[in-house]
């Protein structure tokens, strides 16, 4: 039995999709455990670039089972659009499995998301307006509609009628806008369910059977640790748990069955949306990193905020996710910068602190304590081993591993999968 979790160690967009795709080659099952279509990942496969938001990265390997676990919230319309996107490009999806316990995003979730975000004014969270938060709210409030309900005509209609009575009062009284009729949603979404039905099953059984038969299972996280609803920069977070612990609740696989946890990070830091960002760069170097690294959101197209590598953040991720391995991406983006900086601690009111404060007012006032390292000018995009890196690039990579306390297992020097290099095999480590 071998199972590996891929976790983002920063604010998402660390290159998890590429690393998951890379590791998928040696897995027999690939599963997502949280989030929804708010997370985008770009994958280059067979020389073609694909953008996925919901379906696991392993879908391009038709012999591998791909699972959308119970911890996700699924927009049926978006899922069908993504399936069509793949079918139109000749990609089979017969290997997809969708949990019958996954919650469903409906039109009122999308509307609620947009209205709530607009009402917050300057205090907005930076939501992608995909209905993710409201769907998780309904799940916690025990009024959510699950995939199993969507496939049951009577159950779906009964729950939809109940929910709309409540949601429409919310829209009318709080937002002074019209709600939805049952007719506007019911037939359309029931039909979506019928189109998805062939993929729906108890995915906990699928995953545990695979593990019990000594198959390699890869768990794919979305977003990142700093967007985790419990351990991230709350409230500027997502509505689920991207940390490795999310695997257990989001797939129905016990924690003892997880063997390795790979933390993925960039050689710098980026984030989309609002919230404190201690190492953020507003200068020409920041602009250079953004343009060279093509730092624009896969889902939103928004320019990402960028900054120096923050080892305080990644150490936090190591602790709360139990990281065993490090995958360092986008090292090539730093080429040509004469002096590189790594944040080793924060300074607040004259005191040096080594951990991420829970109080965001404190975090916003933290000043990064930097360690400087010399940069490099050599083209490293063709490098295939640590020894081939220029001395300064290798020292930078090694210092990141030292400061975070995580053993390096992979590093990337470009966006293509053949630019990802293995230092040690995470399935056998």
Curated annotation (Swiss-Prot):
Mind listing the UniProt keywords for this protein, alphabetically?
Answer: Cytoplasm, GTP-binding, Ligase, Magnesium, Metal-binding, Nucleotide-binding, Purine biosynthesis
What pathway does this protein act in?
A: Purine metabolism; AMP biosynthesis via de novo pathway; AMP from IMP: step 1/2
From the Swiss-Prot or TrEMBL record, what is one GO molecular function term? GTP binding
Tell me which GO cellular component terms the UniProt record holds.
cytoplasm
> Which reactions does this protein catalyse?
IMP + L-aspartate + GTP = N(6)-(1,2-dicarboxyethyl)-AMP + GDP + phosphate + 2 H(+)
Q: GO:BP terms for this protein?
A: 'de novo' AMP biosynthetic process; IMP metabolic process
Cysteines joined through disulfide linkages: none
Alphabetized InterPro entries for the sequence = Adenylosuccin_syn_GTP-bd, Adenylosuccin_syn_Lys_AS, Adenylosuccinate_synth_dom1, Adenylosuccinate_synth_dom2, Adenylosuccinate_synth_dom3, Adenylosuccinate_synthetase, P-loop_NTPase
**Binding site residues for GTP:** 12-18, 40-42, 304, 330-332, 412-414
SMART domains in alphabetical order: Adenylsucc_synt (SM00788)
Q: EC number(s) of the enzyme?
A: 6.3.4.4
Q: Where does substrate bind?
A: 298-304
Entry's localization field: Cytoplasm
Which residues are named in the active-site annotation? 13 (proton acceptor), 41 (proton donor)
Q: Which residues bind IMP?
A: 13-16, 38-41, 128, 142, 223, 238, 302
EC class: ligase
Task: Output the CDD domains linked to this UniProt entry.
Answer: AdSS
Required cofactor names: Mg(2+)
Q: Which PROSITE patterns match?
A: ADENYLOSUCCIN_SYN_1 (PS01266), ADENYLOSUCCIN_SYN_2 (PS00513)
Functional summary from the UniProt entry: Plays an important role in the de novo pathway of purine nucleotide biosynthesis. Catalyzes the first committed step in the biosynthesis of AMP from IMP.
- Family from the record: Belongs to the adenylosuccinate synthetase family.
Q: How does it assemble?
A: Homodimer.
What is the recorded name of this protein?
Adenylosuccinate synthetase
Q: Which organism is it from?
A: Bacillus cereus (strain ATCC 10987 / NRS 248)
């Amino acid at each position: 039995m071998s199972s590996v979790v891929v976790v983002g160690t920063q604010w998402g967009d660390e290159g998890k999709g590429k690393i998951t795709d890379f590791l998928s080659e040696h897995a027999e099952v690939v599963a997502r455990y949280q989030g929804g279509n708010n997370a985008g990942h770009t994958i280059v496969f067979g020389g073609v670039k694909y953008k996925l938001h919901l379906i696991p990265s392993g879908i391009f390997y038709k012999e591998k089972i791909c699972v959308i676990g119970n911890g996700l919230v699924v927009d049926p319309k978006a899922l069908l659009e993504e399936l069509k996107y793949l079918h139109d490009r000749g990609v089979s999806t017969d290997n997809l499995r969708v949990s019958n316990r996954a919650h469903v995003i409906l039109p009122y979730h999308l509307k609620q998301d947009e209205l709530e975000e607009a009402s917050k004014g300057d205090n907005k969270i930076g939501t992608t307006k995909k209905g993710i938060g409201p769907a998780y709210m309904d799940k916690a409030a025990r009024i959510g509609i699950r995939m199993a309900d969507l496939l049951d005509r009577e159950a779906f209609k009964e729950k939809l009628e109940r929910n709309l009575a409540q949601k429409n009062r919310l829209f009318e009284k709080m937002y002074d806008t019209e709600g939805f009729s049952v007719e506007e949603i019911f037939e359309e979404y029931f039909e979506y369910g019928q189109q998805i039905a062939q993929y729906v099953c108890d995915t906990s059984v699928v995953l545990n059977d695979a593990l019990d038969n000594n198959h390699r299972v890869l768990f794919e996280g979305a977003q990142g640790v700093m967007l985790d609803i419990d351990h991230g920069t709350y409230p500027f977070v997502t509505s689920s748990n991207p940390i490795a612990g999310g695997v257990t609740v989001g797939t129905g696989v016990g924690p003892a069955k997880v063997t390795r946890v790979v933390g993925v990070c960039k050689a710098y830091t980026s984030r989309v949306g609002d919230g404190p960002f201690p190492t953020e760069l507003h200068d020409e170097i920041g602009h250079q990193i953004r343009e060279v690294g093509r730092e624009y959101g896969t889902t939103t197209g928004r320019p990402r905020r960028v900054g120096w590598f923050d080892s305080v953040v990644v150490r936090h991720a190591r602790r709360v996710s139990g990281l065993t391995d490090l995958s360092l991406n986008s090292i090539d983006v730093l080429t040509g910068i004469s002096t590189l900086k790594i944040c080793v601690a924060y300074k607040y009111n004259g005191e040096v602190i080594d951990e991420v404060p829970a109080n965001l007012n404190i975090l916003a006032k933290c000043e990064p304590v930097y360690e400087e390292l010399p940069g490099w000018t050599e083209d490293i995009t063709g490098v295939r081993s640590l020894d081939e890196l220029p001395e300064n690039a290798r020292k930078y990579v090694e210092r990141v591993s030292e400061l975070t306390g995580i053993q390096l297992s992979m590093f990337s020097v470009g966006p293509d999968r053949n630019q990802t290099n293995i230092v040690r095999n995470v399935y056998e480590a």
